[in-house]
Amino acid sequence: MAPHDDFKTAPVALWLRGRFTNLPRASRMVLLLACAAVILVCMYGTREITEVPQELMEQHLVKEQGGLYRVLKGSAPSVNLVVAATTKEDYSWTKDLKVPGMVVVPYIADDLNATHHAQQNKGHEAMMYHQYFYDFYDDLPDISILIHSQQLSWHVEQLLDQSMIFSLNHLDLREVQRRQFLNLRVTWGIGCSTNTINTTRVNEESGGTPEQKEMQEAFRANFNLYDVPEILATPCCSQIAVTREAIRRVPRKQYEHHINWLLTTGLEDSISGRTWEHMWQYLFLGKAIDCPLEHRAYCRLYHICFGGREEYDEWIELNQGRQKLEEELRKVKGEDGDGKEPEKVEEQKKLTETEEKTKQKSREWLESELKSVSEAIRVRREVAVVRGAVEANRVAEGESLYGDEAEPGVEVKIFPQTVLSARGRSTAVP
């Protein structure tokens, strides 16, 4: 601005100042705030505003507070955690669970004086599950989760740290409500791709599934059906989640019938309990086969999303590679002459002297490779957990849990020639 312009603007400034001072105090405050707003718009109006995704904010909040991994929309569903146990089994680890509103309901198999107990110590967890359904039929929560008493077990997958605490803290309760019944285990290895039940093989012994030859009669007795499904397939191992609606679709009297069958069957206790590992999906869904695609089930149920089938298969292959490296390393470390015949000890010593450097190099190489593979497994798993925190990624993993044209389900991959559907379902009790 040129110096002579001051003479032109000064009278205007004086006039504005006079007008401003003559305004009421409230009007002056409003005018000042309006001016401040205009200045801020001018300063920041051209800047791009980027919002942090809500789910990432939730994930950070939950991580900081050590709580449930998934922040639920709306009020959290009520949950009973039914723990099938004996008096000698410790289930105190349940106090470390972070599921809001969860009530632990222990069912004790061998103590008739316990608050909740089985009528008789028979049928393993199946007896206690049915007793719970019968006892709580009119007082059920939104969701019932029924598990064994062990916190760490092979029944829980390696991807879930083989930990029931990890599994339940990461369980998406909304997904349970959507599906109404599900198995907490998702891998096909036992129950879907191997150790499935063919009910027509009533005379065949099976080392992996000793209950197979009893399944036809067990199914027929429990469901009052003559035409039994040929194939029964679902992930093992009788740890399930089920909604109030699904439980009540089955008449209460039918649970009493299942209890009576477990009490009176001539089958060995271990066999009668195992038959129910293959029948829960039929009881609650009316399906003989319930094997969701693994990577989609992990993504939807536990929010561990690898990004697709190929990426998930790569993670599986890395784990298989790690197992092979561990086996080779054990062999190398065990080649020190233990168990050798006396006349061969001296020869072994000579071989050891000449080959020690080679063995040492092999050991170091195997240890280095094992470390690298283990780190790759860890990183991919952590990335999958982060990816699963975003709902859009869970949707992108695949809509259909049971397969589509791009990725067929278990019926196409494992049982393409088998008639899978049951010929009618009856809930009548004999």
Where do the protein language model's features map onto the residues?
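ER/Golgi luminal nucleotide-sugar-dependent glycosyltransferases, focusing on the catalytic module
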Residues: 2-430
